[in-house]
């Protein structure tokens, strides 16, 4: 990385603007060690020459452990000249202290990760407990409401039964009283006629002969009236007896007597009272269970909240200790002398659902120049990729190829100023590819909030920044060589690794000839339109949130490096885009995982960082063509 300055030289190398932080994929921690050269150049002159030599030797050791992907670009370190024993012992002491600090940092990182996992587990348990308790409470409340409704129904039936009984008794009593009054009236009338007849017969003997005939006629009329009244009384009495007998017969024959037997009615009332008491007892039991369940839920919630608070306090303490260790090992600004991707993730990024918040150390805010935090949004497909690069293999043709990503996934940066060369972190030894994640350096005058959704524009800016960075590295190398030549170098120079080339574009490939070479015949497949760089055709796709199957028109474009799908064949209503960089796997749905697939035998899957797409082809040949087309695009993008 250029010549090394001797410890005796007091002139620091020229400063070059660089990014504050760089987050590298966790799967390749060796790549971050190559940035030591540029970080050493940016350090203040207060650091001694022995520390610079120690860090440069650590850079050499990090470069010798590069992965197989970066092996062609990494240059083996050249043996350094012999140094005095004092410098050697000082360098070994610094190296040992750095190792101890790094070990403590890794231990603290492990504890922090475990505590974060504990906090998440407590949150999950609390959520599950709340859901379970809510379900139990809802069930108990529903059962209690049902029991109360049944109790009210029983009470209403009992009240109606008692009212019917009272009304029936009242009607029977009134009817009997009315019949008794009629019988009494007829009996009194009959008795009056009898008394008149006896009185007339008594007067008949004492009357003279001339009046006796007239009295005999009156007595005869009275006897006739008495006979009529006697017959009427007997008829009325007979009708009453007949009505009573008929009522008794109806009561015996009918299943529901209008006037039930008092014993039966008493039995029914007692049964209703018993059922009512049982329902009330059940209601009391359910109310007690509901109350105890609420108390239990509150107690468990308080316990989980207390455990969560304890875990959060421990997590805060471990993070503070980790920041202190970082300040002991790194610079006052919080940079690491040996960047660790996992530590970088922990200290500088806090992953939310769809955002990465760049955090800054409070010590850096008080000691160094205050800078504003920069926020950039990352699509949810990037979840879990900071510090842990996801790898995948395409089962059809990606067998033994490397799992490194060739180009970055789409990012949406929020910064008002344009991207400068100093705002991008160095990416030496990255084989000419862009870093997977890059944190922008928002200075004091920068403000966050403007959105640049144009991905192609962002890629062009990244290429310009890479070129500017390479130019600055060359200028730095020339300055170092000039300084070494003027001071008479006593040690051999270290040759810089070759400049990484620009990301190569897609190789020239005729898609139609490629498919024909694989044994396909696009001419005989009317459902697919294949040209040299495009492939179009209808597919049935399952929705992401709402699992419904809809027919879409897919357009595979190698020049735009994307697979777009539209609502119409004229390609005017764009519904979604799948970029080549996001494709991980393409495979046949042999497990029949698609939800209610219209044709499971023609269903295949396209796995991306964001989601899993289920698609149904119109024919088997169309399915094979589409799978080979998408696999070819993913192979080109992920080729090592």
From Swiss-Prot:
Which GO terms label this protein's molecular function in UniProt? Answer: enzyme binding
Q: Which residues form a coiled coil?
A: 104-327, 454-481
Keyword Membrane annotated: no
Indicate yes or no for the key word Coiled coil.
Answer: yes
Annotated region (Disordered) at 1-100, 162-189, 241-262, 387-412, 476-504
Q: Which UniProt keywords apply?
A: Coiled coil
Composition-biased stretches, type Low complexity, lie in 76-90
Biased segments, Basic and acidic residues type: 170-189
Residue ranges occupied by any PH domain in the UniProt entry: 532-635
Which InterPro entries did the record assign? PH-like_dom_sf, PH-like_domain, PH_domain, PHLDB1/2/3_PH
Compositional bias of type Pro residues: which residue ranges? 495-504
Question: PROSITE patterns, per this entry?
Answer: PH_DOMAIN (PS50003)
The record comments on the domains as follows: The PH domain mediates the binding to phosphoinositides.
Q: Which PANTHER family does this chain map to?
A: PLECKSTRIN HOMOLOGY-LIKE DOMAIN FAMILY B MEMBER 3, PLECKSTRIN HOMOLOGY-LIKE DOMAIN, FAMILY B, MEMBER 3
Name the record gives this protein = Pleckstrin homology-like domain family B member 3
């Amino acid at each position: 990385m250029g010549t090394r300055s001797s410890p005796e030289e007091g002139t620091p190398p020229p400063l070059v603007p660089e990014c504050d932080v760089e987050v590298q994929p966790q799967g390749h921690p060796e790549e971050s060690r190559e940035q030591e050269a540029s970080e050493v150049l940016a350090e203040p002159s207060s650091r001694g020459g022995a520390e610079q030599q120690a860090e440069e030797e650590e850079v050499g050791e990090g470069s010798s452990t590069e992965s197989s992907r970066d092996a062609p670009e990494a240059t083996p370190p050249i043996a350094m000249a012999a140094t005095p024993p004092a410098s050697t012992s000082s360098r070994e002491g610094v190296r040992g202290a750095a190792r101890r600090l790094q070990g403590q940092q890794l231990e603290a990182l492990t504890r922090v990760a475990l505590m974060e996992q504990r906090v998440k587990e407590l949150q999950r348990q609390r959520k599950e407990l709340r859901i379970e308790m809510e379900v139990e409470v809802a069930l108990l409340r529903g059962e209690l409401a049902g029991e109360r409704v049944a109790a009210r129904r029983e009470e209403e039936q009992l009240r109606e039964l008692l009212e019917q009984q009272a009304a029936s008794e009242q009607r029977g009593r009134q009817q009997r009283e009315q019949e008794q009054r009629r019988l009494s009236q007829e009996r009194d009338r009959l008795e009056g006629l009898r008394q008149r007849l006896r009185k007339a017969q008594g007067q008949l003997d004492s009357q003279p002969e001339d009046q006796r005939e007239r009295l005999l006629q009156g007595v005869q009329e009275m006897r006739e009236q008495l006979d009529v009244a006697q017959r009427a009384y007997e008829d009325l009495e007979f009708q009453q007896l007949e009505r009573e007998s008929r009522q008794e017969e109806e009561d015996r024959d009918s299943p529901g007597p209008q006037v039930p037997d008092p014993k039966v009615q008493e039995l029914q009332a007692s049964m209703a009272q018993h059922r009512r008491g049982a329902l009330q007892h059940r209601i009391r039991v359910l109310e007690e269970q509901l109350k105890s369940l609420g108390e239990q839920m509150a107690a468990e919630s308080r316990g989980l909240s207390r455990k969560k608070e304890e875990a959060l306090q421990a997590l805060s303490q471990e993070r503070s200790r980790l920041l202190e260790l970082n300040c002991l090992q790194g610079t006052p600004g919080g940079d690491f002398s040996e960047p660790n991707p996992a530590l970088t993730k922990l200290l500088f990024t806090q992953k939310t659902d769809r955002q990465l918040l760049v955090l800054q150390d409070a010590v850096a805010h008080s000691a160094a120049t205050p800078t504003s935090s920069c926020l950039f949004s990352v699509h949810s497909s990037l979840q879990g990729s900071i510090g842990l690069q996801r790898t995948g293999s395409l089962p059809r043709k990606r067998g033994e190829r490397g799992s490194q990503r060739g180009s970055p996934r789409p990012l949406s940066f929020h910064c008002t100023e344009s991207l400068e060369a100093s705002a991008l972190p160095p990416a030496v030894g990255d084989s000419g590819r862009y870093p997977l994640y890059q944190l922008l350096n928002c200075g004091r005058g920068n403000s966050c909030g403007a959105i640049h959704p144009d991905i192609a524009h962002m890629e062009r800016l990244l290429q310009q920044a890479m070129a500017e960075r390479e130019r600055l590295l060359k200028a730095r190398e020339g300055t170092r060589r000039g300084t070494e030549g003027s001071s008479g170098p006593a040690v051999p120079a270290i040759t810089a690794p070759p400049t990484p080339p620009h990301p190569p574009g897609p190789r020239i490939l005729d898609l139609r000839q490629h498919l024909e070479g694989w044994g396909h015949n696009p001419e005989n497949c009317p459902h697919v339109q294949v040209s040299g760089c495009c492939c179009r055709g209808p597919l049935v796709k399952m929705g992401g949130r709402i699992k419904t199957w809809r027919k879409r028109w897919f357009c595979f474009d190698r020049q735009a490096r994307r697979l777009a799908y539209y609502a119409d064949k004229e390609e005017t209503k764009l519904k979604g885009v799948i970029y080549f960089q996001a494709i991980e796997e393409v495979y046949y749905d042999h497990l029949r995982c698609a939800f209610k697939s219209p044709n499971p035998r023609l269903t295949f899957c396209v796995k991306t960082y964001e989601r899993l797409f289920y698609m149904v082809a119109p024919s088997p040949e169309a399915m094979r063509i589409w799978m080979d087309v998408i696999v070819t695009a993913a192979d080109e993008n992920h080729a090592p």
